Amino acid sequence: SGRVHALDDVPQAIAAAQYLQLIRDGRDPAGRSVAVLRQQAEQLAQQQNWPSAIERYETALATGQAPALLWLDLSQAWQRRLQSTTDSTLQQQARQRAQQAAWNGLEAARAPFERARALFRLGELYDQAKNSRQALAAFREGLDLEDEPRIAKRYQELAAALAFQIKGVEVDSDSATPKICLNFSDDLS
């Protein structure tokens, strides 16, 4: 099938799994509970101390007891970190980590509303990265699970922008058998 599905992003899945392993290997909860670590992360986020908030979210996730939506909080913290720096290397890392955390949130989600939120988050990140087809697929899958007017509106905008279109026309009228060639936005199959 020529349709792109949000879950077909193998490079993202691999990078997200590597990020999860990095968290497990590099963060030690030292007996602290998810609730305590999450509360600390939220306080640090309110203070816009993104590096420390990220560290606390990651440490909470390292407990193995964290809810799936905590991954989305981490993704949001990485996005705020991205917006708060002008360092291009850090921006690239933050952009990647935000997507990887959202992907891990999708992988960890069990309840339909958790899957929907993770798909919406992933769709927004794909959209910001100008990966419209992946964004469309993630939004579509999320909207199948939960109605969200803002996402539905963006989905319609992307769907219209990506609609099957004629992108170019070439005409060869100088030969004995004139020819026309149409270039489409997608494969015909």
Whereabouts are the PLM-identified features?
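N-terminal leader/linker segments that initiate helical-solenoid repeat arrays
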Residues: 1-51
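N-terminal non-catalytic regions of secreted/periplasmic and cell-surface proteins
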Residues: 10-22, 28, 44, 65-66, ...
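Flexible helix-coil transition and linker loops at the boundaries of alpha-helical arrays
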Residues: 22-29, 58-71, 88, 101-113, ...
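Structural register within alpha-helical repeat arrays
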Residues: 33, 40, 60, 74, ...
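Single-residue signature of alpha-solenoid repeat helices
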Residues: 53, 91-94, 98, 135
